[in-house]
């Protein structure tokens, strides 16, 4: 490809277009990372990009969850090179969706989700043999739900934006899409193993309910830091500081 300063020669300006998903996209963009004020003036542009993405990818269209992928990408590319941020963001979206589409709970990939659920179970049991309870049929739908609730967005829907950026840094540094996907799976395994006692000692329904309540907190407080420890041990994360109220 040549040196980075020549990459702009390979880009082609994107021609925006509309799709049948405009209404849903508009709603989703307005409620994505609502606490992040940086995005507020950019939301119309994000709507336009998702709309264009859906119209170009006719067979895929727009699936809820894509909104969480495009926000962090847009911020990174816009702050890096605003002149080509649209093109770079949509190109990155295309690449991510090629990797993640099968994890979306659309129905056509139900067999793949079950297979991936089996992989998750096996990885968990390898680390903690007592987690063999996850192989019970009662947990099959739960494992599918765990995958489809976090993997399609690479955890962006259950993390604070700054933690999304930290986690994605570790995922994107993998050498290939396969390795990147495997790191995302490892992140899910870390989350499940961290709560192993729920599955080992509690009834199925109770375990699933408690786990669902703790997912966001555990990802924010433990799993992101653990992923950095494993994938980038040279990185040291500063603890978040809180400002005392007057």
Regions found by a protein language model. Give the residues of each.
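Helix-rich, well-folded core regions that mediate interactions or catalysis
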Residues: 1-246
């Amino acid at each position: 490809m040549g040196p980075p300063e020549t990459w702009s020669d390979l880009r082609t300006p994107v021609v925006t277009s509309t799709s049948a998903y405009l209404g849903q996209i508009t709603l989703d963009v307005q409620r994505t990372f609502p606490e992040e004020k940086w995005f507020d003036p950019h939301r119309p542009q994000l709507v336009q990009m998702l709309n264009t993405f859906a119209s170009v990818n006719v067979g895929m269209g727009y699936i809820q969850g894509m909104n969480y992928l495009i926000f962090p990408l847009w911020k990174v590319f816009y702050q890096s090179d605003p002149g080509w941020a649209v093109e770079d963001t949509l190109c990155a979206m295309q690449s991510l969706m090629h990797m993640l589409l099968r994890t979306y709970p659309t129905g056509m990939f139900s067999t793949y989700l079950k297979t991936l659920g089996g992989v998750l179970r096996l990885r968990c049991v390898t680390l903690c043999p007592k987690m063999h309870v996850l192989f019970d049929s009662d947990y099959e739908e739960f494992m599918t739900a765990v995958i489809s609730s976090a993997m399609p967005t690479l955890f962006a829907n259950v993390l604070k934006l700054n933690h999304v950026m930290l986690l994605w840094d570790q995922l994107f540094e993998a050498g290939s899409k396969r390795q990147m996907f495997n790191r995302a799976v490892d992140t899910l395994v870390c989350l499940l193993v961290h709560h192993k006692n729920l599955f080992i000692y509690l009834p199925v329904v109770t375990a699933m309910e408690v786990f669902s309540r703790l997912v966001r907190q555990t990802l924010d407080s433990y799993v992101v830091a653990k992923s950095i420890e494993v994938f980038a041990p040279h990185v040291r994360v500063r603890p978040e500081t809180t400002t005392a109220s007057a």
